[in-house]
Amino acid sequence: MTREEMTKERVTMLEIGQATLQEREGVMALLRANHADNLGEAERRDGFVTTNMTPEQMTALIAEENGVTVARDGAGVAAFALAAPWGFWSQWPFFRNMIRILGNYRFGGVTLTEENSYQYGPVCVDRDYRGRGVFERVFAASLRTMEDRYPIMVTFVNQANPRSYAAHSRKAGMATPGTFDYNGSHYYLKIGRAHV
């Protein structure tokens, strides 16, 4: 069996669900391996994440917010998507900036607020699984965890990350109502309905 055939078989066997505390280290390892700070320029062209989290923050996201959706490959984590109310994200200056500008945007005729929207992302798919429908499966499962609580999801995409922009625009169907700058970087604001 070729590597390609083995990967296809592994993709069909992925289990999608909410992360447990035992999977925290697998999520953290995938986050670190794909963080822009840990990638060369060529690797960043294939997508990257920019959010850093401590083990304690990840524990809270898993245990208190039920906000980590994973694709499991046996005992490992092949992909994840993070999602939580703005209150969780407000501990980061970047997200406090997003909260500050929410009211500048509307979606479906509604002005965005902390009460009617939540922050989705980052999402990360292991390189071996990219382009195989894993993003779509993890994205849909993540939406289901929040759809009863918030009608609107909001995220950001670094303008230097065209792979993420394409995934969120084409595969996730998210709109781009505007852009914003933070700390010398340029971002797209992405908005979508919080249901499958």
Where in this protein do the model-derived segments appear?
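A short helix-loop-beta-strand connector motif used in the catalytic cores of GNAT acetyltransferases and
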Residues: 56-70, 87-93, 119
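Conserved GNAT-fold acetyl-CoA-binding loop/helix
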Residues: 35-57
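Conserved acetyl-CoA-binding loop-helix of GNAT-fold acetyltransferases
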Residues: 125, 131-144, 170
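Conserved N-terminal entry element of GNAT/NAT acetyltransferase domains
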Residues: 1-25, 29, 33, 37-38
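Conserved acyl-donor/pantetheine-binding loop and adjacent beta-alpha core of acyl/acetyltransferases
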Residues: 82-122
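Conserved active-site alpha-helix within GNAT-family acetyltransferase domains
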Residues: 136, 159-178
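Conserved GNAT acetyl-CoA-binding A-motif
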Residues: 116-120, 146-158
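Conserved beta-strand-loop-alpha-helix junction that forms the acyl-donor binding cleft
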Residues: 121-130, 155-165
